[in-house]
Amino acid sequence: MGIVGWPDLSLAQVAEEGDVSRVIVVPDPGAEPWAVTGVLCEGLDLVVHKGLGELSPTRARPVLAKVRGGQAALLTVGVRLPGTVTEIGAEVVAVRGVGRGSGRIRGVDIEVRVASKSARPCRGVLTCGERRARPRLEVV
């Protein structure tokens, strides 16, 4: 696995659950982050690239060619590539357990949206920790 351009990502869970030596981290890929991502895509199974905005088709073409030529799945965070097969979005919609200035987070609701070229868009709410006292009706 490779991680490009995400210096504030905590690898503590990876260290507890697995072998950190199998993760290649490039927190600051320099002036050509997509070149770094392309090279990693040629030899790894999964590459995560964090960036901003949208990559133009001209700039994306060499990276996508390396993804197609290799065996990697490319997961982008915060940046959009032309020809994306599946797009996943998430947003925290509720936090439970925290009062004004005090308390502990006891539960979090995250709305997840998925859009794919081959299926209609869908969304749902993922609850981590304590559930809501009274379930609310949701149309998904």
Task: State what each model feature region is.
Residues M1-V140:
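N-terminal regions of ATP-driven nucleic-acid and macromolecular assemblies
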